[in-house]
Structure formats: structure tokens, C-alpha cells
């Protein structure tokens, strides 16, 4: 218990930063707007009428914030009818939007200052390639070969938004800022309604991405803090206090309550944390926990996560959100790939003098396959082909210039090949290339009111070069005898590009 409290105070002590006065500074909102324009996911401060950032409206907002009844009037206006009181609703909607964007920027300041205050000798080295999504796959190739079971976890959202506010109390002592956060969340939901609170999370995620991202990252870092502590102390858990992963506030009361509900629970099951080979990966609201051991051990971990979220964050998560898989007998969808660790048999002939032996060796290999059906469904949704995979024209692009049409189709094809370059079998990618190439030809033929055959004969090799991917260009230098689009030598070659930091719905259809 004392060891856990010391670890908690060392890494998560409350910060004595008061950020509320910064909300009265005009440059904060200008910085938030500029940050959204330059970010990887542009987030503009807009009004309900799609009007962009206005310094004049920001000045009016700051003046009104000094008024005593500003917040009360804002709540009243937000509950009024849009048609009957459009002017007041417009200002209320705009002020709420711009305040939430500015608050998200201001709330990140204590966390940034804490990182800057760390001694230089304790700084974690930063590698640019760690930003890439593909940097995960080489790690999985090295680690998953020695593991047995995998838990695929869908990280649950807190049902009640007040939980998100309480999590920030451990890090920020600025009470006015916390009250302001409650005001923003109250703007999106009726706090007395459970169903409305669940809907408000998705509404907040859609309209205020930066604020939602900040709250979600705070929640994720909180639960990963407990998981990291248990992971570091796994070899000492049988001797440590059994309640170290519970919430720090009202610790004794919760311990007694937990002890009454589940007498002797910890003493009997603490041993299942003794696992030195455990690896954790988080991505897109999901997490993967892989380790050695038995299936019974993984079931214990599943029960732990259910009770962990229930008693640490006061909300129930469905056990079906945690899927248990055996790596040798099943595959799992991960960032657009179907991944698995199958066992393959390798027959080796050993010759010793006049005697020869056949040695049967079993090996594991981290296999990644591109799923054909979901990708074709994504192309069908984007109107490049039918549901069965037959290419069709895209009429909405017929008004563009010919080279713009070629560039758009070629860029989609190159992006698909670029992202799925680590696939062990690339037949699916060549099928997608055929669909996009023929869809492009039919779109151009429709624009010029011609046939596909006539149009392709007129363009010739120029049309094909637009779909010649970067990966094939690299291999064509290695194998000079290959010709355009007859090249098939890269089927078994796997390249993980370390410059991919985001993916779209077309590349990642499984989610």
C-alpha cells in the first residue's frame, strides 16, 4: 500500500497550476484556431452557420464572460428553440464551440509543463519512426512468436461524463476550470438521464474533437497508469497489498465494501498476475494484451478487467468486449490486416557420414493477410465497383480534367499498396488494382462518350504508369527482367513503411 501511494505521488501528483485566467486572453483562441489548421486532423472553430474564426466575436465573448450572469444565460439560450430565438442560439452555439476549443488548449498546459520540468537526464528518447502505425508490426513479429494467447479488448467509454471530470481532479487543482468543464459537458447532455449521457459522448466526439480527445486521453492514461503499476510490480504482487489497484479516494471504505462483496477474493486469485511475458498494444479505442500461459490464466485476466473498470471507474463493462484467442488456432483483425501466428512444418535433411536423417521442425510465423471482402465492400461503398467486385464508372468525377481523374485513382491505388505493403500475400492488392484501373478507364470513357477499349488504346502505357506503385518500382530495379504489371516477385516480400501516421476508412475497412 505505501509503495503504491509513493508511486502514485511521484508520477501523478496534483499540479499547482491555475489555468482559468488564460481563458480571458484573446491569443488563446487564435492559437487554438491556428493549431487546428496545422494539425494532422484539421479542427476549425466554426459556428452553427459555418462561419469561421472571428476575432471580433472573440472580443465580445471575453467581455461577456466578465458579466455575472453570462453562464446562466448561455445555458438558457442553449435550451431554447433555434427558430424562435435564432440570434441568441447562434451566439450560444458559437461561444460554446470556441470556449471548448480554447479550454482544450489551456487544459493541456499543466501536462506540458510537467513534461518540461523533468530532468534532461531522465528524458525518454524520441524516435520519429515511432509515430508510424507500421512501427507496431515489427514489434509484433518479434514478440508474438513466443506467446500463446491474445486478449482483444474494446476499451469502454465512461457512461457518465462526471467520471471524466473526477479523473482530472488528480492532476489539476484549478477548481474554476473543473466547473467550466462541467458546464461544457452539461451543454451536451442531461446529467440526470443515463441514455442522454451515453449519446452526449458521441455528440461531444463529433462536434468538439479536441476536447473529446483531451478527455479521452486523460481517461486512458489513468487506467493505463494502474495497469503499468501492476505490470511493473507483477513479481511482487503476492506479497503486496491486495487493494493497490483501487481508487485512491475513500480507499479504506472501498476495501471494506469489496471485501464484504467478495470475501477472500484477492488471496485466492492474486497469483494469476505472475506473468513475466506480457505485451500491451493500444490503438483506435482498442487494446491487445498478449502473454504466455494457459487459457485459465487469460480468463482470470478477463475477470480482472471487468472488476477493474467497475470498482476503479464506477461503470460496468460487458465481458463480451474482451475476446480471448489462441494465437496458433485463430486470427484477429488489427489495423486493416488479418493477423495470425500459424505453425508451419519444416522438413530438414541431415547427412552424417553414411547415415541421413529427416528432422521435422515446427516453426511459428507472424502472418498478415489483406482481407479481400471488406476492402471490396469499401470500394463498393465509394462507388468504384459493385458488391461483387465488378468495376463501374464514377459519374461524380466526370466533370474533372482527365489528369485529375487519373491522379485520384492512382493515388488511391498507391495508398492501398503503400499501407498494405507488409502483407505476406498480395493477390488481393492486385485484384484491387484491377478494379481501380478499370473503374478509372470506364470513368474516362464515360466522360468522352467512348468505349473502354478505344480509350485505353489511345492512352497506352501512360495510363498504366499512373497505377505503377512505389513498391513495384523498387522491386523493378532489383529484377530488371520484369515488365509492367506482369511483375509478381513481391508476393512474398514484406515492407513496413515507417511514415504512415494515419489511415482512412478505405484503408481500414474492418473498423
From Swiss-Prot:
Pfam family membership, one: MatK_N
The protein's predominant localisation is plastid
Reply yes or no: does the keyword RNA-binding apply. Answer: yes
Signal peptide range in chain numbering: none
Biological processes per GO annotation: mRNA processing; RNA splicing; tRNA processing
Q: Name one GO cellular component term.
A: chloroplast
Q: List the keywords (alphabetical).
A: Chloroplast, mRNA processing, Plastid, RNA-binding, tRNA processing
**Molecular-function GO terms, alphabetical:** RNA binding
Summarize the protein's role: Usually encoded in the trnK tRNA gene intron. Probably assists in splicing its own and other chloroplast group II introns.
Q: What PANTHER family would the database entry show?
A: MATURASE K (PTHR34811:SF1)
Provide the family line.
Answer: Belongs to the intron maturase 2 family. MatK subfamily.
Full protein name: Maturase K
Amino acid at each position: 500500500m505505501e509503495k503504491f501511494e509513493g508511486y502514485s505521488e511521484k508520477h501523478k501528483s496534483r499540479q499547482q497550476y491555475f489555468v482559468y485566467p488564460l481563458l480571458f486572453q484573446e491569443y488563446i483562441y487564435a492559437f487554438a484556431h491556428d493549431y487546428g489548421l496545422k494539425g494532422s486532423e484539421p479542427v476549425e472553430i466554426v459556428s452553427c452557420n459555418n462561419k469561421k474564426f472571428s476575432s471580433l466575436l472573440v472580443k465580445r465573448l471575453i467581455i461577456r464572460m466578465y458579466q455575472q450572469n453570462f453562464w446562466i444565460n448561455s445555458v438558457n439560450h442553449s435550451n431554447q428553440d433555434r427558430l424562435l430565438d435564432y440570434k441568441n442560439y447562434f451566439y450560444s452555439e458559437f461561444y460554446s464551440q470556441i470556449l471548448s476549443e480554447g479550454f482544450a488548449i489551456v487544459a493541456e498546459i499543466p501536462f506540458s509543463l510537467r513534461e518540461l520540468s523533468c530532468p534532461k537526464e531522465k528524458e525518454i528518447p524520441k524516435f520519429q519512426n515511432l509515430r508510424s502505425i507500421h512501427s507496431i508490426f515489427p514489434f509484433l513479429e518479434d514478440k508474438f512468436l513466443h506467446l500463446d494467447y491474445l486478449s482483444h479488448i474494446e476499451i469502454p467509454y465512461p457512461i457518465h461524463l462526471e467520471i471524466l471530470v473526477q479523473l482530472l481532479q488528480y492532476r489539476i487543482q484549478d477548481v474554476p476550470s473543473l466547473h467550466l468543464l462541467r458546464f461544457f459537458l452539461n451543454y451536451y447532455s442531461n446529467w440526470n438521464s443515463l441514455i442522454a449521457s451515453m449519446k452526449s459522448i458521441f455528440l461531444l466526439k463529433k462536434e468538439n474533437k479536441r476536447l473529446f480527445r483531451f478527455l479521452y486521453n486523460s481517461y486512458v492514461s489513468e487506467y493505463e497508469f494502474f495497469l503499468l503499476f501492476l505490470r511493473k510490480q507483477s513479481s511482487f504482487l503476492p506479497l503486496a497489498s491486495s487493494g493497490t489497484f483501487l481508487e485512491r479516494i475513500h480507499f479504506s471504505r472501498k476495501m471494506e465494501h469489496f471485501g464484504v462483496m467478495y470475501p477472500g477474493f484477492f488471496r485466492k486469485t492474486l497469483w494469476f498476475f505472475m506473468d513475466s511475458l506480457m505485451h500491451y498494444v493500444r490503438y483506435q479505442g482498442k487494446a491487445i494484451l498478449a502473454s504466455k500461459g494457459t487459457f485459465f490464466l487469460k480468463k482470470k485476466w478477463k475477470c480482472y478487467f471487468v472488476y477493474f473498470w467497475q470498482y476503479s471507474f464506477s461503470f460496468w463493462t460487458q465481458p463480451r468486449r474482451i475476446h480471448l484467442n489462441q494465437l496458433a488456432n485463430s486470427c484477429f483483425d488489427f489495423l486493416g490486416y488479418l493477423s495470425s501466428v500459424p505453425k508451419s512444418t519444416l522438413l530438414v535433411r541431415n547427412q552424417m557420414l553414411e547415415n541421413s536423417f529427416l528432422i521435422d521442425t515446427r516453426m511459428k510465423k507472424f502472418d498478415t493477410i489483406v482481407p479481400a471482402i471488406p476492402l471490396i465492400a469499401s470500394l463498393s461503398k465509394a462507388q468504384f465497383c459493385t458488391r461483387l467486385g465488378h468495376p463501374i464508372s464514377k459519374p461524380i468525377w466526370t466533370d474533372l480534367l482527365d489528369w485529375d481523374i487519373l491522379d485520384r485513382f492512382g493515388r488511391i491505388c498507391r495508398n492501398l499498396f503503400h499501407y498494405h505493403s507488409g502483407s505476406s500475400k498480395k493477390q488481393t492488392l492486385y485484384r484491387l488494382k484491377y478494379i481501380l484501373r478499370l473503374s478509372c478507364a470506364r470513368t474516362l470513357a464515360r466522360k468522352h462518350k467512348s468505349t473502354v477499349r478505344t480509350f485505353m488504346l489511345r492512352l497506352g502505357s501512360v495510363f498504366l504508369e499512373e497505377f505503377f506503385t512505389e513498391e513495384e518500382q523498387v522491386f523493378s530495379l532489383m529484377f530488371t527482367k520484369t515488365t509492367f504489371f506482369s511483375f509478381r516477385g513481391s508476393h512474398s516480400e514484406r515492407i513496413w513503411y515507417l511514415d504512415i501516421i494515419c489511415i482512412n476508412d478505405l484503408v481500414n475497412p474492418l473498423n
